[in-house]
Each structure stands twice: as C-alpha cells, then as structure tokens.
C-alpha cells in the first residue's frame, strides 16, 4: 500500500513486472479488492486504487464530481513518475 504525498489517496502496486503498467479502476460502491482474482493473469505491473470515498481513500470534500475522480487518477500517475 502506498499513500500519495499530495493527496489522501491510497493505491497498491501489485504483480510487479518490467512491462508497461496497467491501471485498474473499480466502480462505485466497490474497492480495489474487486480486482484480486484477475491480478495474476497479467504479465504486467498492476496498479489498483480506491476511488474517492471508497475503501481506504477518504472523501476530500462533501461533494465530489467526475472531475475529482479524474484528478485523483492523474495525481496517482504523477506519484509514480
């Protein structure tokens, strides 16, 4: 589990391999664990995370939008650079 410095996001790097990483995003009402059965099927590093207000990632404000979810993903990708 990794906590992003610039936000309260929590993400997980799994199945670490040398190939291009894959990002898996769960749906509303779920969390990163939904992907556990599929992780080992990939020959790539897999990045999974909990979207805002789900799993181990708290809400950052009372109302969130699709823009907030997009920003969250961009922040997580930046964190990996």
Regions found by a protein language model. Give the residues of each.
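Alpha-helical elements of Rossmann-like donor-binding domains used by nucleotide-donor carbohydrate transfer enzymes
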Residues: 11, 34-37, 41, 68-75
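A short loop-to-beta-strand scaffold at the N-terminal edge of the catalytic core in hydrolase folds
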Residues: 4-16
């Amino acid at each position: 589990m990794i906590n992003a410095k610039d936000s309260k996001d929590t993400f997980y790097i799994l199945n670490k391999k040398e190939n291009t990483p894959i990002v898996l995003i769960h749906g509303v009402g779920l969390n990163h664990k939904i992907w556990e059965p599929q992780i080992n099927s990939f020959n790539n590093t897999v990045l999974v995370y909990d979207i805002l207000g789900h799993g181990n990632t708290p809400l950052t404000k009372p109302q969130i939008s699709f823009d907030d979810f997009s920003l969250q993903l961009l922040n997580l990708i930046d964190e990996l650079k």
